[in-house]
Amino acid sequence: MDKNTGITGIIRSELALAGGALTIILVSVFGSGWFGDLSNPLWYGFLFGWLFCIMLWLAFNVVRHADCLAELLGEPYGTLILTISVISIEVIMIAAVMLTGDNNPTLARDTLFSVLMIVLNGMTGLTLLVGALRYKEQVYNLKGASAYLGVIIPLAGLGIVLPRYTTSAPGGEVSPLMAVYLIIMSIALYGVFLAIQTLRHQSWFKQPATEAGGEAAENMHGDLQVRSLGYHALLLPLTMLPIIRLSKKMARLVDHGSGTLGAPQALGGFLEAILVLSPEAMAAVRAALANQLQRTMNIALGSSLSTIGLTIPAGLSISLFTGKTTE
């Protein structure tokens, strides 16, 4: 029997979930003492590194289950599940910081900027480079990329740029009326795009047929142990649960680092972006190396769009219900 198909294989593949559960138990029992005094930089660094590594490990396993679902369901649903699952982690972390920490009005905006810069410049550029070095020339569906950019640009303009030019509130603060408008527009635009991607124009987001003489796309999921649809559909949210639980403690550490240690407030958004995007970056690079540039574009541009489409409504809704300002 294959060692990866039995109970032992399942246990081995879900060690991250076990590590997350153990961390939750330890934090629940000893958390009040461990997180009560963070004045020691070494102790603070240890706690931050521990939680960051555990949450990153869990995030990679979320991506693994999403990749298995992608193999079972096909495109564009596979990439859609991947991007929404991973970006949901980011939204949860932002919500945790906003609800548990001191008022940080620019956190959501800093995270949006970080994600857009990392994805549209770093991740996309890296995947194009490694794909070109291996295959010289790759193809993707331009209509799909244009559809992504056609929604990313207005959403970014509305959510990041427009509040700086309105006079209803000082600086970049979002007034209640503007917040309601941005929530409705973000949900509407993102919803229309999802309808285009999953219903009307699915072919725009699938890998084009390889031209005669070109290299065929490889199976990038060959090293995955794909089990049943129900198994991965259950384990994906279960693997996200420890991240949700630990995000409150991580929020406290980020808030302490931004305040007490004098770190810039934008650092919190950058760290959250790195934590969330690292697994997706690996998936995008694997797709490029497998000559599936369309999946790479779906992951990269889908991450940017999902970030804006989900973070803006979530952040502004929390701001409206809690009374905390958002810029």
Task: Please give the residue ranges for each predicted region.
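Hydrophobic alpha-helical segments, chiefly the membrane-spanning helices
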Residues: 1-327
